[in-house]
């Protein structure tokens, strides 16, 4: 199985890191091309493009200006240890063993507006560039046009390497839109997490994001390789809901 997840807006470059062997991202030439265009923007342009405050616009302007193809311990850290949103709280990569990191390196990909598709231990300089950003570039009107089939091609290459025909989609819709399902050499399985509220089960964003991270960790820590094994997921009170599921969508529910 190959798991795909979204990145996070919040970053952590301060927490002491475990000793891990880092790797180099595969699509850095593409990243550099994007950065070249982003460096032309003024701080206020960054704010407008990303719909963020002037303070955050200046922060990300500075990040773009300082970005380079030289990745060091001083300016970068492994992606899975740099992102710090709800998904990554659930994933809790700081608790990974060496075996967990090794499995994740082969079976987990983080979709990224700037880096395309990252392995967990790929070094990453801090940035913010959401996949849905309408940043016009040499390849088209937005980042979906920029990445084209490259992310899908990278996933297909990894599916072949690990001998799998299953992609576990734990990414948001915004990010999974960068993948071309018809060109993907594998079945897409999408776990969905719902909470009991006001007399029915519904998706609550905060809990769903954390649960995507939990499911990713569950697969990694248990070294799962078969879709059927996902149905045993029972962390944080979730259980597989057969009645609400269909072939490709696995629904997990809980009553708090």
From Swiss-Prot:
InterPro entries: YaaA (IPR005583). Transmembrane segments: none annotated. It holds the Pfam family H2O2_YaaD. One of its GO terms (biological process) is response to hydroperoxide. GO terms for cellular component: cytosol. PANTHER family: PEROXIDE STRESS RESISTANCE PROTEIN YAAA (PTHR30283:SF4), PEROXIDE STRESS RESPONSE PROTEIN YAAA (PTHR30283). Belongs to the UPF0246 family. NCBIfam families: PRK02101.1-1, PRK02101.1-3. This is UPF0246 protein Sde_3824. It comes from Saccharophagus degradans (strain 2-40 / ATCC 43961 / DSM 17024).
